[in-house]
C-alpha cells in the first residue's frame, strides 16, 4: 500500500514537472518567435526609411538640376552664366549618384518626375526673366530647404540605427554643396530681388510641398 502511494505521488510530481517544462518551452518558443518578428519589423522599417530617402532625394536633385537649366536658358550669356552652369553641373552629379543608388537599392522612383521636370524648369526660367537677383533668390530658398532636409535625413538615419555609410556620406557631401550654393546666391544679390521675403517664402513652401509629395508618391 505504501509503495502504491509513493508511486502515485511520484507520478504526480513527474506530471507537474512535465507540465512546467512544456509551459516553459512554449513560453521560450513564443519569445523567440516574437523576437524574430520584431527583428523582421525593424528591418522592414529601416528598408522603408532608406527607400523614402533615396526616392525623395532622387526627385529633389532632378528638380534642382531643372531649375538651373531653366535659369541658363535666360542667363547663359550673362556674367552670372558660368556660375549658374557650375552649380547646374554639381546638381547633375548629385542626380547621377541618386540614379545609381535608386538602381542598386531597387527603389521605385516617384511617379511625379514629369511634373518636377516641367515645374523645375519653369521656376528657373521665370525667375531668371525677373532678373538675376530673383534667380539667385530661388537658389537661396531652394537650397536652404534642401540642406535642412538633408540634416533631417541624417538624424532620421541615426535615430533608426541605420548604418549605411555610403548613403550617409552622400547626404553629408550633397548637403555641404547645397549650403555652398545658398551662400553663392546670397553673395550675388539674392536679397535685392523684388519682394524678396514673400517670394522666398513662396518658393520654400513649394519646395517643401514637393519634398512631402515625392517622399510618399
Curated annotation (Swiss-Prot):
Positions bound to NADH: 52, 216
Primary localisation category: mitochondrion
GO molecular function: 3-demethoxyubiquinol 3-hydroxylase activity; 3-demethoxyubiquinone 3-hydroxylase (NADH) activity; metal ion binding
Catalytic reaction(s) noted: a 5-methoxy-2-methyl-3-(all-trans-polyprenyl)benzoquinone + NADH + O2 = a 3-demethylubiquinone + NAD(+) + H2O
Cofactor note: Binds 2 iron ions per subunit.
Compartment(s) where it occurs, according to its Swiss-Prot or TrEMBL record: Mitochondrion inner membrane
Cofactor section: Fe cation
Superkingdom assignment: Eukaryota
Coiled coil: none
Keywords: Iron, Membrane, Metal-binding, Mitochondrion, Mitochondrion inner membrane, Monooxygenase, NAD, Oxidoreductase, Repeat, Ubiquinone biosynthesis
A cellular component term, taken from the record's GO annotations: mitochondrion
Sequence repeats: from-to residues: 49-130, 131-217
EC number(s) on file: 1.14.13.253
PANTHER family reported for this sequence: 5-DEMETHOXYUBIQUINONE HYDROXYLASE, MITOCHONDRIAL (PTHR11237:SF4), COENZYME Q10 BIOSYNTHESIS PROTEIN 7 (PTHR11237)
Note: This protein may be expected to contain an N-terminal transit peptide but none has been predicted.
Family statement: Belongs to the COQ7 family.
Protein name in the entry: NADPH-dependent 3-demethoxyubiquinone 3-hydroxylase, mitochondrial
